[in-house]
Amino acid sequence: MAGELSIATELPTSPLAMEYVNDFDLMKFDVKKEPLGGRPDRAIRPCNRLQPTGSVSSTPISTPCSSVPSSPSFSPTEQKTHMDELYWMTNSYQQVNPEALNLTPEDAVEALIGPHQMPPQMQGYDSFRGHHHHHHNNHHHQNHHQYQGLPHEEMGLPHQHPHHHHHHHHHQPSPSPSGSSSSSQQLQNSHQQHQNSSAVEDRFSDDQLVSMSVRELNRHLRGFTKDDVIRLKQKRRTLKNRGYAQSCRFKRVQQKHHLENEKTQLIQQVEQLKLEVSRLARERDAYKIKCEKLANTTFREAGSTSDNPSSPEFFM
């Protein structure tokens, strides 16, 4: 706490300096250089009361006091050069909002030193100032045009970046006409290729592709593109494979029907042979019975003739 109080005593306490930073435009008003002598009548005030009541400043209140360098113009004991004043003004410029004040540290240095006291080493820096001031004014004009409908409290630096990103989020670039034209050209080319391939396929029928030899097909395909030739030969190969599969299937079905018919015929022949065998067996049995009857009749006749003799030798 003691260190912070000691740092706060070294800060500029003049209300004119704070109003010079916050309210006035250095391009319109001449700034009177204060003498280097001490100012005992100026009361030292704390760092948190440096901002006037009626002034509007974009500097955050939470800025630490140690980040603000002391003013060389208010030092009662030490003589500062113009380069030290330049360093103090550039550091003070970093603590305020440059967008709200619309000034650069080079403007403050030029107003403080004057055109007749410009050292030689500042001439190169002054040439760089013109380009930087032009770029700074263009950037401020763009931000003012973008946020001209917002209140003054919402134009601070912390609030500009979210609106800026939100603006870019909602206004994304639309596809270029060259991309749409290239896509339409690709669709047209693909449609034309499809028509050409259809014309090539319609030129030959399926029967012609199957019956045509490879040499004859190559002779007819001269002048066509490689993709069309490959597609047509693939179609011919597919048709031939399909025909071969259908032929094999037909042959298998035909052979199956032939075998079934032959089987039926063989079954019928077996039945006929069975009937013939049964008929022959019946005839055999009949002939056997007839043969037995004839044998019995012959034996009886032979026995009767031997029992009744009729010859004259029988009586002798």
Swiss-Prot record:
Here the disulfide bonds are none
Where is the protein localized? Nucleus
Record's compositionally biased regions (Basic residues): 130-144, 160-172
Which residues does the annotated region (Leucine-zipper) include?
259-280
List the GO terms this entry assigns under cellular component, sorted alphabetically: nucleus
Q: Where is this region: Basic motif?
A: 231-256
Pfam families associated with the record: bZIP_Maf, Maf_N
Q: Which InterPro entries match?
A: bZIP, bZIP_Maf, bZIP_sf, Maf_TF_N, TF_DNA-bd_sf, Transcription_factor_Maf_fam
> Composition bias, kind Low complexity: at what positions?
55-77, 177-198
Self-association state and partner proteins as the record states: Homodimer or heterodimer with other bHLH-Zip transcription factors. Binds DNA as a homodimer or a heterodimer.
Protein family per UniProt: Belongs to the bZIP family. Maf subfamily.
Name of the protein described by the UniProt record: Transcription factor MafB
